[in-house]
């Protein structure tokens, strides 16, 4: 989240920023009408009165500033705009108002952030809908490659995810490190998100650049509800490109329920990882060892 500074040049400007932040419309009007406060005055980081009012969701102050000539599309040093802040904080009434006066969805922050990415990251479904209706690019990405869908998946915002998918978001679009939306949803334990993405065509075996898959990550974390959803789509249970398996990860995590789920799905306890280790060699947990050995017998016979 972008932080705001409130260091001002003059006491009157300081008062104006306080009024915008607190939603004190009467004081804000008084200061603006005095002619001694520029409607586009900035703090040391380029923050404007409009940005502050938009961030706080004070629609009356936003309206007053715009009607007094505030530049809607000014950017802070970080690249953020009033629209970005309103979207980030979920103030849909402010977002709609700003669009009525020419707010642009094209501006980016220093890390590539846009209003759509911010709204998706924080789960503001109505704001996402408004932004898309006003031309926001569904394929916006942070400079690390994260899309709106990726950020919504990371947060587990199912309503936003459904909206983005219905609007044409690419379900398998990864970040630069290869992390796909399904992978991040699995890592965070969002089983309903995982289910929806799989039904919409997410690659069950999509791997990050380091070779880990969604199943391996869920096994490592012990997210059994996620694992159950992934297993419905028959993901790879064998040794992955990174030289280990989901079963190895589950054994290391010490979650016997996870180990049982994978074994019941057909994971092979006789497979060795890149260090030539069997899953059973990675634990001293007697219950897990008994479970592994109970599955080894039939395979060796």
Swiss-Prot record:
Keywords: ANK repeat, Repeat. ANK repeats lie at residues 11-41, 45-74, 78-107, 111-140, 144-173, 177-206, 210-239, 242-271. This is Ankyrin repeat domain-containing protein 29. InterPro entries: Ankyrin_rpt, Ankyrin_rpt-contain_sf, Dendritic_Spine_Reg/Scaffold. It comes from the Eukaryota. PROSITE patterns: ANK_REP_REGION, ANK_REPEAT. PANTHER family: PROTEIN VAPYRIN, ROLLING PEBBLES, ISOFORM B. SUPFAM superfamilies: Ankyrin repeat.
């Amino acid at each position: 989240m972008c932080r705001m500074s409130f260091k001002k040049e003059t006491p009157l400007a300081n008062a104006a920023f306080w009024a915008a932040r607190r939603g004190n419309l009467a004081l804000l009007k008084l200061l603006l009408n005095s002619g001694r406060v520029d409607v586009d005055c900035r703090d040391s980081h380029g923050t404007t009165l409009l940005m502050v009012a938009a961030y706080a969701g004070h629609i009356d102050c936003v309206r007053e500033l715009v009607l007094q000539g505030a530049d809607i599309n000014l950017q802070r040093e970080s690249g953020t705009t009033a629209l970005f802040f309103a979207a980030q904080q979920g103030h849909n009434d402010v977002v709609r108002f700003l669009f009525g006066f020419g707010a642009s969805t094209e501006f980016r922050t220093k890390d590539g952030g846009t209003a759509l990415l911010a709204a998706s990251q924080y789960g503001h479904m109505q704001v996402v809908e408004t932004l898309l209706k006003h031309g926001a690019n569904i394929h916006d990405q942070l400079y690390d490659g994260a899309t709106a869908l990726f950020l919504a998946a990371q947060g587990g915002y199912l309503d936003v995810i459904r909206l983005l998918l219905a609007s044409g978001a690419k379900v398998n679009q990864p970040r630069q490190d290869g992390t796909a939306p399904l992978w991040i949803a699995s890592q965070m334990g969002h089983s309903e998100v995982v289910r929806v993405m799989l039904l919409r065509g997410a690659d069950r075996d999509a791997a990050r650049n380091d070779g880990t898959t969604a199943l391996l990550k869920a096994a490592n974390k012990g997210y059994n509800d996620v694992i159950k959803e992934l297993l419905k789509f028959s993901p790879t249970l064998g040794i992955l490109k990174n030289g280990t398996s989901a079963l190895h990860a589950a054994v290391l995590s010490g979650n016997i329920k996870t180990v049982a789920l994978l074994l019941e799905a057909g994971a092979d306890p006789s497979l060795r990882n890149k260090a030539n280790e069997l899953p059973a060699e990675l634990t001293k947990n007697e219950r897990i060892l008994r479970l592994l050995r109970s599955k080894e017998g039939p395979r060796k016979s």
